[in-house]
Each structure stands twice: as C-alpha cells, then as structure tokens.
Amino acid sequence: MELCHSNQLKIGLKIIYNNEPCIVVSNEFIKPGKGQAFFRVRLKNLLNKKLIDKTCKYSDCFKIANVIEITATYMFTDKKVWTFMDKKSFEQIFVEKNIIKNVLPWLLEQHDYIISLWNDQPISIVYSSNFIELIVVNTIPNARSGAINTYSKLALLNTGVTIKVPIFIQIGQIIKVDTRTSEYISKIS
C-alpha cells in the first residue's frame, strides 16, 4: 500500500485513518512563531460521513486508501439488497439498504449511478447526474386556502417521492428535479 506524508495530503485524496477510508477536505500549513511547524488537516470519513480535525507533524505518514468509483446500472431489488451491473466489467454489485438510503428517492431501473468501492465493498452511491427526469403521478393542491404563497403544490413522482412544484404542473407530465436538494427545476413535457 502506498504511503504519503502530511505535506502531500491534497484536497480530494483518499487515505486510511483509524482503519477507515477518509477523504481530505482541507490541509493547512501552520508555522507558529515558536516551536515546530505542523499541518492542520480536516478529513471526512467515507463510511459514516463525520468530519475529523487532525493536527499532524511533517513526519506523519498515511496509507492511501484503495477507493475506486465505478459507473453501474441499477437492475432490480428484493427489498433487502439492490443489484447493480458494472458498465465496464458487467459484474453484479450488491448494495445494502444502509448504503443506498440516500439515493432511494431517485432510484430508477436502467439508470446509471456512481458507486464507491473500498476493498471491493460498496461504501457509497450517488446518482450519476445532479438532475433526474421523473413523471408526475399525482398532484395535491395547496391545502391552505387564502395562503400568501399559492404558487406551488405537492406532486407525487413515479419513484414515490413528494416535492413542491408550480401549480401549472399536471399529472403525467415529465419534470426535471435536482437530486441534491429535491427541488423542482423545470418542466420537460
């Protein structure tokens, strides 16, 4: 396994810290008026998403994590395990609910997702794009009559997620949604 020193920790580098994969969020060189220089490093744990602040000496070494990202197509689920197919090797990848929970509202068969693997085990999954096109299955008018903001209503989408949409959106129309914020972007058709 490859090693790197504190001064080689660049933003985005994936390393092993406390036997878990982490990504470097920031690395600041500090030269105090008195004493030895050091690095103030901020890491994000890739398994539990917690931020870690660490002070390192120049001589501190870290192992580079074997984290790879692959593009895979969602195939099917049995409600316990979600099955994806690697687009390059055509191997099946099995993802458990605790890993897939953040992308469940946007999960559609035959769509591509980016899966991060650490030691050949999935640790995270994201939609391959920041935007997704979904079909409006049902709309619920704004329940508060006389409300100041009556420019939006709730819409149930074909993945089961409910979001706010403009009042002109009808059942059966296709809309573009931002997967990061769960917000309506535009009407497609």
Swiss-Prot record:
Pathway assigned in UniProt: Protein biosynthesis; polypeptide chain elongation
UniProt keyword annotations, A-Z: Cytoplasm, Elongation factor, Hydroxylation, Protein biosynthesis
Highest classification ranks of the organism: Bacteria, Pseudomonadati, Pseudomonadota, Gammaproteobacteria, Enterobacterales
GO CC field: cytoplasm
UniProt keyword Protein biosynthesis, yes or no: yes
Function: Involved in peptide bond synthesis. Alleviates ribosome stalling that occurs when 3 or more consecutive Pro residues or the sequence PPG is present in a protein, possibly by augmenting the peptidyl transferase activity of the ribosome. Modification of Lys-34 is required for alleviation.
NCBIfam families the record matches: efp, PRK00529.1
GO molecular function terms attached to this record: translation elongation factor activity
Keyword tRNA processing found: no
UniProt cross-references to PROSITE patterns, sorted A to Z: EFP
Residues carrying N6-(3,6-diaminohexanoyl)-5-hydroxylysine: K34
Native source organism of the sequence: Buchnera aphidicola subsp. Baizongia pistaciae (strain Bp)
Protein name per the record: Elongation factor P
Family membership noted in the UniProt record: Belongs to the elongation factor P family.
Subcellular location field: Cytoplasm
GO BP: peptide biosynthetic process
Domain of life: Bacteria
PTM (free text): May be beta-lysylated on the epsilon-amino group of Lys-34 by the combined action of EpmA and EpmB, and then hydroxylated on the C5 position of the same residue by EpmC (if this protein is present). Lysylation is critical for the stimulatory effect of EF-P on peptide-bond formation. The lysylation moiety may extend toward the peptidyltransferase center and stabilize the terminal 3-CCA end of the tRNA. Hydroxylation of the C5 position on Lys-34 may allow additional potential stabilizing hydrogen-bond interactions with the P-tRNA.
Gene responsible for this protein: efp
PANTHER family according to UniProt: ELONGATION FACTOR P, ELONGATION FACTOR P (EF-P) FAMILY PROTEIN
Stretches of the chain forming a coiled coil according to its record: none
